[in-house]
Amino acid sequence: MTQMHSTQPMSIGIVIVAAGRGERAGSPEEGPKQYRAIGGRPVIAHTLEKFVTWPQTTKIVIVIHRDDEKLLRSAQETIVDSSGVEIAFGGTTRQQSVLAGVRQLEKTGVSHVMIHDAVRPFFDHDLLDRVAAALAAGAPAVLPAMPVTDTLKRADTDALVTETVPRAGLYAAQTPQSFRLADILAAHEKAAADNKTDFTDDAAIAEWAGLPVTLVAGSADNVKLTIKRDIAMADEKLSAGLLPDVRTGNGYDVHQLEPGDGVTLCGVFIPHDQTLKGHSDADVALHALTDALLATCGAGDIGDHFPPSDPQWRGAPSRIFIEHAARIVRDHGGTIMNADVSLIAEAPKVGPHREAMRAKLSEFLGISLERCSVKATTNEQIGFVGRREGIAAIATATVVYRGGRP
């Protein structure tokens, strides 16, 4: 690796290239690979966080597709502070996207730029320090790279090997590829003006423009996530070190009894000489469990989602509420592991209907019967429950969420 020396002061800006669509990484429905989750967060969040927390970062520009701004903002929410990050919109090729990012970064006045693939999340600050040291020593272009270790073959159009390529002196290029900003901007502008669009990385443009490119040691971990299996393996790697994110939510509800023909508990109608008074069907058990589920992801309570002042919920079956809460949990990345309901009532007797209630909970929540529990007790004729003026319910939900981050 070449060593160069200079005392030129510098400031480093970052261009993260994230405008690609990632056709090789799965179906379009799965979204661009830079926004797929690994270890509970989008790929780009891991990449961005490394630069945000690197002490030498002066400014960051992320180049994205115009359709992805909402995805990026969502990813940024998982990072402690990325408020100073700017967005540029990319073109139809990586080369066009890099040019857009470097043009925007130039306005900030930084002297040097690191250009990095968003889908290389496993670099570290040591790598950035090595690149920065080479820039500080006066190198106009710096390329982190790893010596090629695999045997290389050249083949003809019929897939027949024509030769074994000597690997001595061959390196696999990585990012961030880093430059004096004015030099690489001029090189990109000239390439665009000359309609030269066949470059596979920024170092190749620098070479074409006559800039000497200095190699520094890359990192074996600094792999590019290209295909679907890469993303799955990255997720396995990061998830292995995460604590399980197990959350417990509690809910409580009570409804008054009045003369009637029966009560609905856990979605099961039980004939009785009283009924529960409420805006909906007054299923006190499902109301308590709805609150318990919402509590596991900080999503408020049943009144926030279904206000009793709204006439559309008058007489509504409470399965609407519990299924809505279960969807919210799943949208937040949660898996419902257990639902437990304790009913407190003098009458009617719950025991004969317990299994039907458990079956309803299993149906509403989409979980197995063994994960659903219904219990009942009296209040020993004490208080409003003991006087048969109402029924109370206490519910607990256990949910496991992806990620394990506090």
UniProtKB/Swiss-Prot annotation:
A molecular function annotated in GO for this UniProt entry is:
2-C-methyl-D-erythritol 2,4-cyclodiphosphate synthase activity
Where along the chain is a divalent metal cation bound? 253, 255, 287
Q: Which reaction does it catalyse?
A: 2-C-methyl-D-erythritol 4-phosphate + CTP + H(+) = 4-CDP-2-C-methyl-D-erythritol + diphosphate; 4-CDP-2-C-methyl-D-erythritol 2-phosphate = 2-C-methyl-D-erythritol 2,4-cyclic diphosphate + CMP
Which residue ranges does the record annotate as region 2-C-methyl-D-erythritol 2,4-cyclodiphosphate synthase?
247-406
For this protein, the Enzyme Commission number is: 2.7.7.60, 4.6.1.12
Q: List the disulfide bonds.
A: none
Q: Which InterPro entries match?
A: IspD, IspD/F, IspD/TarI, ISPD_synthase_CS, MECDP_synthase, MECDP_synthase_CS, MECDP_synthase_sf, Nucleotide-diphossugar_trans
UniProt lists the family membership as follows: In the N-terminal section; belongs to the IspD/TarI cytidylyltransferase family. IspD subfamily. In the C-terminal section; belongs to the IspF family.
Q: What is this protein called?
A: Bifunctional enzyme IspD/IspF
The organism encoding this protein is: Rhizobium rhizogenes (strain K84 / ATCC BAA-868)
